[in-house]
């Protein structure tokens, strides 16, 4: 039965069926396992034919072995099956799969040992690479001398990485893609990968933070060994070495290849992946548990969402496998879940998706119900049919195999791919437009009611690759209808395409049957049918194993009008099969009419239809020109005439070709382009001559009529319809559609590039010494062959292209230099851009300047020093293309300088891979930079300019780093490596900038070159507050409606200033306030702002800005000696900030609280905070906060809890147990503050209670616990715990709950909050902790207007301070004071010292309390004896 069953024959099949699947198991290998393995190999794009030999199996195992560690269970099963099959082929006697795997491992070990021995004997470089200690992956390889060398990461890899980030952003797929692309990379390579995506600053900052944390952890775990490093021994890497910031490439290679190795690349990669995981979690916050299939959601869409989320989950592969096996089925909708459970636990994903195809929604339910009802009423129907009531009632039929009598879900046959209704792949049954199942229709072989014809040679060039089954000598009637309609002579035999299953109606023994024409089957097998004559029993190998059949000989069968006599087997086959024994008799052949180019299938965007744009009127000469052009195109088969049945239309027009009287046809495909699917551009950019290697022989070819040589998808052609109108509507318009790729259609470039690559691939493989650069229809062909041999190869290439329908006209075949290619002029040893002529005009339009800038940009890649900034300034604003623009003096000067530069021709040289790349950058001023990339001084590979300003506020160092990144990225694309940079900036300046500013942990290798003007930082901010300098608290406020605002400052020295502003914003006022502070301060100043916006601008140390106020701030900063800038959060009661905020807010901030309403509502939905907490946290008026609480249905149960209780000693706690949902919750309340601690305990025992009290005492200062008389509180365990923790235990009055009033009321409050959040948590213990959090930190009120959490901390802190103060007071009372009053020179006293300050003391003399300056007081210790007289206050007792 087919090719897959013929992998083993004879004795090998017997041996195969004796091998057990598991050691000691009952199940053995069967033929179905080979069929499964063949299908799996096809799925993984491996040739199933390899299974037929031992060598083939060995090749498959080599391919699969590398994927075993990370692969799915299916891959492992496939490997096991192939390993067992290999043993059968090699006649190795094995009893089960495990024994087969052991044998394979033994063979591989022996083979490896032999290889290593051979390598040791020969000492060959190639053999050395097989050593396990050497990385066989890039970028560290071993050269012929045995040295470890670094092979740079390829530009293709880097381009792939850039595209991954651009396409996927930071979705879960990024992590496996990064892991695969960075296999074996060094830290330098990894940093290169990070650098080229450095534009994603937020993500890179997160990544940097993770790397820094991991590096710090590494340093802590791996401390530096004391003493010097022994000679010849490498130092141990630090965290920053692993991150590549403080280590050289050679050091990294040394660590990675030492014995034992330190895999710094893998360690750094692991850190990066940790960071990427955090980024992915931020971008994809959905949990796998939340992925559930919607009631009508297709199973395929659900699976896509499931696996996308699964990739983002942080779990091991085993856990992910478990999630796939369990959650995928568990979270499916009920309809799919029923089917999936019926499939059993071992079902593959493909089987699940096939089984669940078309499931879901009302149509599916109706169908299932109809099938169930038809099954239930079968017997009744049979009785009624006998009576003649229901003649010809339809029996139920299986969607899967087409047989009657059972349902698809009960079908034993293998699940059929494609739609269960029409048999076609590419859609599900629920989306099928056919009314009945196609694979049971009599005319399936000829779906359009006509036969396929052999295409003519011209048509074949433009038709899709097709595979057809032809039955020779059939009757004419089947094909003539279609032939007559199209007016084409057809062959007389039917042709059956293989785009669908080739099912035809055959007549056997006078009965009609649907049967599959199977050229892979030896025998003809039919399901149960009554045939005349004798039969013999027989066993045949089928798809599901062996089946028993009856063999009838010499049976007449009629297929497509042809008769044959042969053997027919009758048995329980899932599908009727006509095998080769009958097909050969009727002359049936399998034909492969290969069209030169396979068409690429194209579709419209989902839910869209083709364009229906009316044709606009055309002049007579344009209509005539278009008619002639279309006649020629029709003759060449490029377009096809169509009738009115095509409803689509796209407008067409004509323009005259440049410098010619000939016309050119243009079709406006703008509308079709909007509706066509998106395409992936196969080529990311154009090749650059600087990246070409110098070649002896070069040829440049052009492909003629490039697009018109590639066929368009047949199903899509109808959408390209256009109409050529007639003059004065004399006749209906002539309608055409394209057979080939149209000019101007969005899909043409991508499809052409893809087709061209496929066509050139065999030539490139056959001739590796020839380099072909391909961009659209331009081909550059270079080689180091002699010119004669080279030209022979060129002719071979032209013939190869011609076979595929591509012509290379002699007119554009360039054999001698200079070669004109892609806008460049190529010479044997140099290149330049094609000559550029700058126009000289009296007046310039916008269009003229745009073209001029384009030419200058093109020239800048080899002419150094080109500038366009002033010319670009002329184009600012929305201007029409024809508007006249006067040139400014600066623009005229810039244009004149550019003319001078372009006067002398400049050439670039070609790339030499053996030499280093060097990039040198010079500053041109006004934010413009020029650079040269060379390998030898004064021989530039290419030049360029950089003038892009990425932000409104910048400085030269920042622009220089952006230019470096741009040049590095450009170099990676062209040469696959970064150059060494020579920059006009001193190391000290660079370091000062980079230590403070953000970096992606990678700075390219560079050196200082003294090329004026040098880059410098014009000012530097201090990192610590300046001692002795005045501190300015600055703030600004603006009203959004009136645009009025205020800016001002207050200082720590009592100064303050406020200015009123008009037409301003909050951000401008914040900057204006900083400017005021800088204006009014001395040479050194501390400034404190609450604006992150202003802080961000100034901390980046800009030296130029588009904002006038920022430029004024920069001028002030340059004049200062020292400036310290700090930030504090706004509205948090911070001294000076609060004062200046009140100062600038008066009369301005009226509606600013509206900003906080949304955030407050969001927080209330999560925590159900009370109105005081929201008013405080979000700056809301009480009425607004109360309204939010009033609109919440969960907060309206019993009103809001009353707050405010007696201020008791801060050491007293009340404890109680309460019950909820059948569980016990123990609650402890801090009486003074209302702060609670609670948790669910397993039992109300003394042991659990004692443990809770000890936990409480470990967190807070507990002096007294007040409890009721419950047995758990009066237990010995609790008494022991209280004794140990020095806690006094008090008991309430029996049967009087009021003695436990505080904790009782808190129990009610806690249960109320639990009720509000219960649905957010799965378990009660989680809800309890959520409720504790909300009560302690999200509810404010009572003493001080604090939350309970703030209040307990404040009370404990106050208690400590009070005790400390009390100690100080006690000490102070041991002193006496003698003092002089006013101008009286007589000392008085002794008085009692109450308080001692910096400038004065407070004393009590008799009953009077006085304040005396320190200079007029003498403080002495009281020794218990009274001083004798007023003048006896001698110095020995003096305190100061």
From Swiss-Prot:
Span list, region RT 'primer grip': 819-827
List ligand-binding residues for Zn(2+).
Answer: 1164, 1168, 1192, 1195
What keywords tag this UniProt record? Activation of host caspases by virus, AIDS, Aspartyl protease, Capsid protein, DNA integration, DNA recombination, DNA-binding, DNA-directed DNA polymerase, Endonuclease, Eukaryotic host gene expression shutoff by virus, Eukaryotic host translation shutoff by virus, Host cell membrane, Host cytoplasm, Host endosome, Host gene expression shutoff by virus, Host membrane, Host nucleus, Host-virus interaction, Hydrolase, Lipid-binding, Lipoprotein, Magnesium, Membrane, Metal-binding, Modulation of host cell apoptosis by virus, Multifunctional enzyme, Myristate, Nuclease, Nucleotidyltransferase, Phosphoprotein, Protease, Repeat, RNA-binding, RNA-directed DNA polymerase, Transferase, Viral genome integration, Viral nucleoprotein, Viral penetration into host nucleus, Viral release from host cell, Virion, Virion maturation, Virus entry into host cell, Zinc, Zinc-finger
Q: Where is this motif: Nuclear localization signal?
A: 26-32
Name the EC number(s).
3.4.23.16, 2.7.7.49, 2.7.7.7, 3.1.26.13
SMART domains per record: ZnF_C2HC
Task: Write out the ranges of the annotated region (Interaction with host AP3D1).
Answer: 12-19
**Lipid-attached positions, N-myristoyl glycine:** 2
Co-factor: note: Binds 2 magnesium ions for reverse transcriptase polymerase activity. Binds 2 magnesium ions for ribonuclease H (RNase H) activity. Substrate-binding is a precondition for magnesium binding.
Tell me the ranges covered by the Peptidase A2 domain, including all copies: 513-582
Q: Can you say what this protein is called?
A: Gag-Pol polyprotein
Give the organism's phylogenetic lineage: Viruses, Riboviria, Pararnavirae, Artverviricota, Revtraviricetes
Protein encoded by which gene:
gag-pol
């Amino acid at each position: 039965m087919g090719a897959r069953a013929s992998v083993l024959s004879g004795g090998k099949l017997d041996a195969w069926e004796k091998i057990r699947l598991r050691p000691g198991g009952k199940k053995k290998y069967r033929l179905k396992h080979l069929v499964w393995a063949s299908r799996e190999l096809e799925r993984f794009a491996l040739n199933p034919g390899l299974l037929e030999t031992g060598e083939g199996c060995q090749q498959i195992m080599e391919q699969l072995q590398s994927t075993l560690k990370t692969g799915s269970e299916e891959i492992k099963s496939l490997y096991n099956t192939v390993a067992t099959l290999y043993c059968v082929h090699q006649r190795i006697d094995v009893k089960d799969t495990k024994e087969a795997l052991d044998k394979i491992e033994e063979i591989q070990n022996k083979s490896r040992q032999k290889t290593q021995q051979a390598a040791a004997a020969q000492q060959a470089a190639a053999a050395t690479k097989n050593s396990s200690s050497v990385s066989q992956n890039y970028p560290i390889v071993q050269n012929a001398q045995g040295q470890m060398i670094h092979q740079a990461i390829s530009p293709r890899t880097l381009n792939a990485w850039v595209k991954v980030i651009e396409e996927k952003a930071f979705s879960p797929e990024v992590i496996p893609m990064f892991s695969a692309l960075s296999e074996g990379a060094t830290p330098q390579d990894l940093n290169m990968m990070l650098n080229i995506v450095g534009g994603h600053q937020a993500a890179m900052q997160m990544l940097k933070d993770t790397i820094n944390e991991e590096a710090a952890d590494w340093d802590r775990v791996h401390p530096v060994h004391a003493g010097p490093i022994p000679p010849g021994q490498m130092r141990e890497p630090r965290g920053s070495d692993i991150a590549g910031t403080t280590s050289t490439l050679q050091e990294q290679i040394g660590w990675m290849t030492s014995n034992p190795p330190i895999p710094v690349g893998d360690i750094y990669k692991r850190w990066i992946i940790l960071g990427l995981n955090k980024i992915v979690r931020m971008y994809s916050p959905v949990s796998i548990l939340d992925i559930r299939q919607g009631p009508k959601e297709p199973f395929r869409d659900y699976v896509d969402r499931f696996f996308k989320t699964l990739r983002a989950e942080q779990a091991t592969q085993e856990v992910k496998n478990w999630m796939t096996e369990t959650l995928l089925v568990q979270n499916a909708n009920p309809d799919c879940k029923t089917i999936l459970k019926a499939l059993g636990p071992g079902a593959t994903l493909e089987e699940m998706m096939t089984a669940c195809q078309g499931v879901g929604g009302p149509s599916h339910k109706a169908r299932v119900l109809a099938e169930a009802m038809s099954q239930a009423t079968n017997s009744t129907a049979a009785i009624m049919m006998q009576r003649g009531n229901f003649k010809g009632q339809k029996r139920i039929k299986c969607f899967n195999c087409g047989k009657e009598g059972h349902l698809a879900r009960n079908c034993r046959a293998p699940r059929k791919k494609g739609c269960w209704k029409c048999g076609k792949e590419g859609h599900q049954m629920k989306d099928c437009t056919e009314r009945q199942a196609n694979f049971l229709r009599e005319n399936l072989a000829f779906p359009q009611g006509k036969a396929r014809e052999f295409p003519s040679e011209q048509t074949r060039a433009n038709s899709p690759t097709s595979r057809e089954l032809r039955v020779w000598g059939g009757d004419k009637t089947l094909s003539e209808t279609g032939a007559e309609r199209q007016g084409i002579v057809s062959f007389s035999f039917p042709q059956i395409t293989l785009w669908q299953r080739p099912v035809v109606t055959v007549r056997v023994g006078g009965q009609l049957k649907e049967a599959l024409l199977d050229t892979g089957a030896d025998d003809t097998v039919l399901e149960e049918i009554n045939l005349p004559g004798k039969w013999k029993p027989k066993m045949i190998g089928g798809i599901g194993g062996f089946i028993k059949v009856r063999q009838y000989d010499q049976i007449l069968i009629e297929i497509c009008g042809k008769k044959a006599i042969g053997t027919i087997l009758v048995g329980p086959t899932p599908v009727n099969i006509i095998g080769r024994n009958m097909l050969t008799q009727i002359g049936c052949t399998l034909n492969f009419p290969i069209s030169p180019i396979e068409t690429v299938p194209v579709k419209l965007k989902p839910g869209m239809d083709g364009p229906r744009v009316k044709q606009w009127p055309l002049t007579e000469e344009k209509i005539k020109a278009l008619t002639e052009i279309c006649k020629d195109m029709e003759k060449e088969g490029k377009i096809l005439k169509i009738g009115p049945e095509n409803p689509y239309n796209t407008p067409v027009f004509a323009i005259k070709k440049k410098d010619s009287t000939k016309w050119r046809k243009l079709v406006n495909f703008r509308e079709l382009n909007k509706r066509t699917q998106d395409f992936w551009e196969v080529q990311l950019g154009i090749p650059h001559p600087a990246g070409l290697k110098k070649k002896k022989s070069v040829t440049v070819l052009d492909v003629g009529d490039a697009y018109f040589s590639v066929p368009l998808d047949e199903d899509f052609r109808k959408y390209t319809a256009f109409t050529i109108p007639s003059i004065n509507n004399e006749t209906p318009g002539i309608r055409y559609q394209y057979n080939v790729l149209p000019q101007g259609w969005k899909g043409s470039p991508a499809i052409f590039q893809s087709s061209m690559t496929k066509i050139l691939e065999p030539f490139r493989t056959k001739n590796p010494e020839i380099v072909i650069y391909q961009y659209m229809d331009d081909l550059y062909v270079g080689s180091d062959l002699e010119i004669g041999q080279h030209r022979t190869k060129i002719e071979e290439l032209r013939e190869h292209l011609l076979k595929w329908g591509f012509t290379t006209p002699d007119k554009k075949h360039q054999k001698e230099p200079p070669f004109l290619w892609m806008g460049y002029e190529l010479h044997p040893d140099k290149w330049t851009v094609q000559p550029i002529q700058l126009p000289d005009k009296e007046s310039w339009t916008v269009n003229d300047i745009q073209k001029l800038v384009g030419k200058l940009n093109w020239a800048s890649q080899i002419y150094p020093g080109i500038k366009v900034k002033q010319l670009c300034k002329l184009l600012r604003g929305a201007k029409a293309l024809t508007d006249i623009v006067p040139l400014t003096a600066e623009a005229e000067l810039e244009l004149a300088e550019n003319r001078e530069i372009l006067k002398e021709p400049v050439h670039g040289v070609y790339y030499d891979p053996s030499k280093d790349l060097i990039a040198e950058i010079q500053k041109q001023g006004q934010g413009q930079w020029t650079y040269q990339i060379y390998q030898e001084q004064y021989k530039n590979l290419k030049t360029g300019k950089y003038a892009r300003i990425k932000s409104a506020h910048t400085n030269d160092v920042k622009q220089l780093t952006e230019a470096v990144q741009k040049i590095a990225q450009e170099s990676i694309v062209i040469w696959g490596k970064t150059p060494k940079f020579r920059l006009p900036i001193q190391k000290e300046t660079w370091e000062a900038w980079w230590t403070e500013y953000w970096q992606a942990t990678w700075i390219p290798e560079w050196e200082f070159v003294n090329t004026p003007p040098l880059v410098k930082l014009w000012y530097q901010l201090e990192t610590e507050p300046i001692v002795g300098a005045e501190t300015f608290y600055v703030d600004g406020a603006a009203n959004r409606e009136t645009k009025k605002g205020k800016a001002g400052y207050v200082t720590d020295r009592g100064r303050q200033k406020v200015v009123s502003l008009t037409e301003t914003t909050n951000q401008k006022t914040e900057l204006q306030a900083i400017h005021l502070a800088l204006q009014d301060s001395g040479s050194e100043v501390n400034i404190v702002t609450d604006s992150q916006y202003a802080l961000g601008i100034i901390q980046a140390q800009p030296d130029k800005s588009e904002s006038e106020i920022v430029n004024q701030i920069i001028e002030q900063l340059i004049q200062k000696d020292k400036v310290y800038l700090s930030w504090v959060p706004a509205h948090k009661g911070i001294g000076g900030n609060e004062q200046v905020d009140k100062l600038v807010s008066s009369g301005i901030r009226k509606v600013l609280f509206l900003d906080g309403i949304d955030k407050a509502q969001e927080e209330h939905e999560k925590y159900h905070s009370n109105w005081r907490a929201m008013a405080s946290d979000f700056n809301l008026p009480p009425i607004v906060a109360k309204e939010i609480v009033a609109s919440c249905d969960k907060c309206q149960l019993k009103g809001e809890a009353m707050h405010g209780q007696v201020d008791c000693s801060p050491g007293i706690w009340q404890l109680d147990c309460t019950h909820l949902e059948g569980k016990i919750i123990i609650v402890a309340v801090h009486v003074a503050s209302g702060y609670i601690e609670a948790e669910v305990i397993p039992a109300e025992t003394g042991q659990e209670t004692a443990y809770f009290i000890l936990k409480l005492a470990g967190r807070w200062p507990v002096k007294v616990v007040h409890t009721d008389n419950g047995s758990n509180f009066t237990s010995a365990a609790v008494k022991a715990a209280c004794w140990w923790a020095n806690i006094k235990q008090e008991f309430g009055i029996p049967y009087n709950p009021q003695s436990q009033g505080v904790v009782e009321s808190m129990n009610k409050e806690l249960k109320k909050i639990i009720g509000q959040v219960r649905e957010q948590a799965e378990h009660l213990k989680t809800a309890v902790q959520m409720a504790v959090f909300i009560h302690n930190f999200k509810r404010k009120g009572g003493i001080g207007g604090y939350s309970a959490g703030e209040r307990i901390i404040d009370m404990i802190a106050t208690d400590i301070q009070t005790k400390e103060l009390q100690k100080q007071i006690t000490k102070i009372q041991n002193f006496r004071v003698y003092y002089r009053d006013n101008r009286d020179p007589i000392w008085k006293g002794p008085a009692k010292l109450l308080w001692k300050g910096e400038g004065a003391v407070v004393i009590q003399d008799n009953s009077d309390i006085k304040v005396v300056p320190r200079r007029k007081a003498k403080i002495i210790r009281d020794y218990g004896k009274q001083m004798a007289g007023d003048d006896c206050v001698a110095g020995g007792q003096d305190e100061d």
